[in-house]
Each structure stands twice: as structure tokens, then as C-alpha cells.
Design a protein with these regions (language model features):
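Residue-level recognition of single "structural anchor" positions
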Residues: 1-265
Length: 265
């Protein structure tokens, strides 16, 4: 249970002690040379709190070296609180909200939020799904209604999705999700993403749109549901997982961020 009054979110010594416990469960190691057993805490009135010395490479370090908190002038306890708030907020946390809760400038909160999100990014992620696993594919449209826009920005044609941004997503049931901002929903656009991000041994689930029917045979099995006739679930076949993801995404944009530009979508 989250307690905003916890010491690690309000005190530098407690925050440093918490991070050392989490990062060094078996004792401190040198982030410069990797030595595991020759680190010594530097003590004394003039010593910077949390400073360590490596007897192997003779370099100094703190627990923040090699982390997203390194070389930051923002207190560590505020970094820990910001990290927790972003990770615990199901619909996301805006920089304006962080700015108000942490007591830092908006510019600082914006920087912190981006650095934390970058630290959460997967490094060399493998494909979604795999043998016996199911991946759902679908697209959604993000953006305001044409009638609510200034007349200068309105599109001349009033058709579904006109003037909106397209987000194509892949969701691994009970697993990971990946989203892509795409210019259109044709098979030529979606196929390179699908075959690069999803293991060919996966079961693919989608709606009955033509672009998915073309790509379906490339996977172990492809099942569809026809929303046009009111079909949403047929045994194991459904896209409810990805629809739920899109619902959270849109509520987050509307309720937390209010507006997201094309660049940051």
C-alpha cells in the first residue's frame, strides 16, 4: 500500500538507504569496475553523504551512479516519489500534476517524467507471443470531434476517423503491449509492424477487417470477430483485452493529459 508520508519519500538519508537496499541487496559493488567486495563508505564531517570508495579502481561513487538519478540536482526522495507516482498511476501522470505534488518547476517535472519513462523502456525486447500464446491486434483513432475544432482546422470531408490520429496496438494476453502511431491502416502499413513484433508461432486475434485477414495466414492460427454484426466474443476469439487497453489510453489522455500532440502520441 502506498504511503506518501513514508520516510523514503520525504527524507534524503531514508531515500538513499532505501535505494541502497534495493540496488545492493548483497552489499555495495563498484559501478565503475564491477568489483564486489572492496567498497568502503567514506566517513567524516567533510565527506558527502552516501559516498563510497572502491579499493580496486580507486574511484568514488554513490548509489545513484549508473541510474536515471545520476548527476541530478533534484533531491533523491523526490525522484523516488515521482517514480512511484508514475508507476502507480494506471492512466498516467502529467508533468503539471508532478510539478504540483513535488513542489518543483514544470520544466523540472517534465524532465523527470521523461527520464523515468525512458528508464522504463525495454532494451532489445523480444517478439510478443510465442507458441501457445495469444496476441490481439487492433487500431483506434485519437483526437477531437471535427465539430469542436476551430473552423480553420476542420477537415472538409466528414467521414469516420477523418482528422484523427491512428494508433495501432498489439496486446499479449496477460502480458505486454506495444503501440505504434501509424499514418493509415492498410495491410502495407501494418504488416511490417505485425511480423516484426509478433512471434509467428502465436495465435492472432483481430476483428474482421480486410487488412488482418490478409496477414492472418502468416501465424499459427488467426481468428476474428465480426463487430459489424454484433459479434464480440466467440469462445476463445475476442479482442476485449486490446479494447480495454484502448479504453485506459483514451481515459488517460482525456482525464490526465487533456491533449497529446502528434509528436508525443
Amino acid at each position: 500500500m502506498f504511503d506518501i508520508t513514508a520516510a523514503r519519500f520525504n527524507s534524503e538519508p531514508a531515500a538513499r538507504k532505501h535505494l541502497e537496499k534495493v540496488r545492493w541487496p548483497d552489499g555495495p559493488f563498484c559501478p565503475h569496475c564491477g568489483c564486489l567486495d572492496r567498497a568502503h563508505r567514506i566517513k567524516g564531517k567533510s565527506a558527502r553523504p552516501g559516498l563510497w570508495f572502491c579499493g580496486e579502481c580507486r574511484k568514488q561513487f554513490t548509489v545513484t551512479v549508473g541510474t536515471l538519478f545520476e548527476r541530478s540536482k533534484v533531491p533523491l526522495h523526490k525522484w523516488l516519489l515521482a517514480t512511484h507516482l508514475i508507476c502507480a498511476s494506471k492512466k498516467g501522470m502529467s508533468a503539471h500534476q508532478l510539478h504540483r505534488m513535488l513542489g518543483v518547476t514544470y520544466k523540472t517535472a517534465w524532465f523527470m517524467a521523461h527520464r523515468i519513462r525512458e528508464g522504463m523502456r525495454e532494451i532489445n525486447p523480444g517478439p510478443l507471443g510465442g507458441e501457445g500464446k495469444t496476441v490481439e491486434a487492433d487500431e483506434t483513432y485519437i483526437g477531437g470531434k471535427e465539430k469542436n475544432k476551430h473552423f480553420v482546422k476542420r477537415k472538409k470531408r466528414n467521414i469516420g476517423g477523418q482528422g484523427k490520429e491512428i494508433v495501432f496496438a498489439l496486446v499479449e494476453r496477460s502480458g505486454r503491449v506495444r503501440s505504434h502511431h501509424v499514418p493509415e491502416v492498410s495491410a502495407n502499413t501494418l504488416r511490417p509492424i505485425l511480423v516484426a513484433q509478433v512471434d509467428r508461432k502465436s495465435f492472432l486475434m483481430s476483428d474482421d477487417a480486410g487488412q488482418y485477414r490478409v496477414m492472418g495466414p502468416e501465424f499459427a492460427r488467426h481468428e476474428t470477430v465480426n463487430h459489424g454484426i454484433g459479434e464480440y466474443v466467440r469462445g476463445h476469439a475476442h479482442t476485449n483485452t486490446i479494447e480495454g487497453y484502448f479504453s485506459i489510453l483514451k481515459r488517460g489522455i482525456t482525464g490526465v493529459y487533456h491533449h497529446v500532440s502528434q509528436k508525443h502520441l
